[in-house]
Curated annotation (Swiss-Prot):
PROSITE patterns: MAPK, PROTEIN_KINASE_ATP, PROTEIN_KINASE_DOM, PROTEIN_KINASE_ST. It holds the Pfam family Pkinase. Induction: Up-regulated only marginally in response to chitosan. It comes from Physcomitrium patens. GO terms for cellular component: cytoplasm; nucleus. It is an enzyme of class 2 (transferase). This is Mitogen-activated protein kinase 4b. The active site is at residue 169. One of its GO terms (molecular function) is MAP kinase activity. Transmembrane segments: none annotated. Activated by threonine and tyrosine phosphorylation. Activated in response to bacterial and fungal pathogen-associated molecular patterns (PAMPs) including chitin, chitosan and peptidyl glycans (PGNs). Activation in response to chitin requires the CERK1, MEKK1a/b, MKK1a/b/c and MPK4a/b signaling pathway. Slightly activated in response to necrotrophic fungus B.cinerea spores. Not activated in response to osmotic stress. ATP binds at residues 49-57, 72. The gene is MPK4b. GO terms for biological process: innate immune response; intracellular signal transduction; pattern recognition receptor signaling pathway. Its cofactor is Mg(2+).
Amino acid sequence: MDVAGAGGGGAADGNIQGVPTHNGEYTQYNIFGNLFEVSRKYVPPIRPIGRGAYGIVCSAVNSETGEEVAIKKIGNAFDNRIDAKRTLREIKLLRHMDHENIVAIRDIIRPPTRENFNDVYIVYELMDTDLHQIIRSNQPLTEDHCQYFLYQLLRGLKYIHSAKVLHRDLKPSNLLLNANCDLKICDFGLARTTSETDFMTEYVVTRWYRAPELLLNCSEYTAAIDVWSVGCIFMELLNREPLFPGRDYVQQLRLITELIGSPEDHDLGFLRSDNARRYIRQLPRFARQPLDRKFPNMGPAAIDLVEHMLRFDPARRITVEEALAHPYLATLHDINDEPICHSPFEFDFEQPSFTEEHIKELIMMEAIAFNPGNVGDMMS
């Protein structure tokens, strides 16, 4: 589960005992066989609340502020340059962003010693669950819930896009929720600035939410890729099942064209590659299905908004600002309460020559920025 703090699960009483280390400055916990070593200010109840390819997420309490937080441990974070860069990206981006609908980073736990710095612990604000869990649950969702979740997702995305950043991995498990129905976007490890749209490797983005231009290897993609993902997420929210659950690339494109219709030649202007155009033209042809017939539970305004999000040609897809101003969101939209980011985010640490050691140094500096005291002890 790829979340920075979704609640539930694990040792429910949080009664995990810690062992003091490094002269009592840190405490080590054993969580399902995972060693979790955090600064002593983070105290029980410690509960495992999520795990993924990167490691494990636990909730804890910051004894200095009384706030419950989510701590993500990324084990052996510097073994692989790509993953190390992803961690640095997430930290840098979340420190740059400040928005109600984007998860806040609270701390990078400073490693006790420089030479044994292998695991990164990122501390986030704690949320209760994520949209994936809610969609899969039996919890009833009203149209008002769905509308409010969509509004907050677009509101956060407006801020992200205004910072000249594409999220690139929007999916239900990356949208955190609390009991108030507040929604926060998380997991920025795959984000890119609009000027560095390198092609994404297969393992990267979840295929089901991937826009046609990415499925077709288009290298010059835009913020419209995130809008496509939002359309897929919104439909999944309303219908409680994925819209395009493709098993592979070929089936993914087929599911898309079966629903929204095969693209016409004028929809393919974004494709620079003749091979991609030829590939599209030789696929079986499908007529567009009327969404109101296929999804009779959806009202006309919701259908209209989704149809504008799920357009094959990214240039004809609705923008986030236009979506916020759509009649479907009229009761929530307030342009004066939809802030933008005033300084574009710069990935100025992206030199190809950066080694794992360079990245380790940069993450160390981030940890020191959060915890400036006693830096000399750590350096020695």
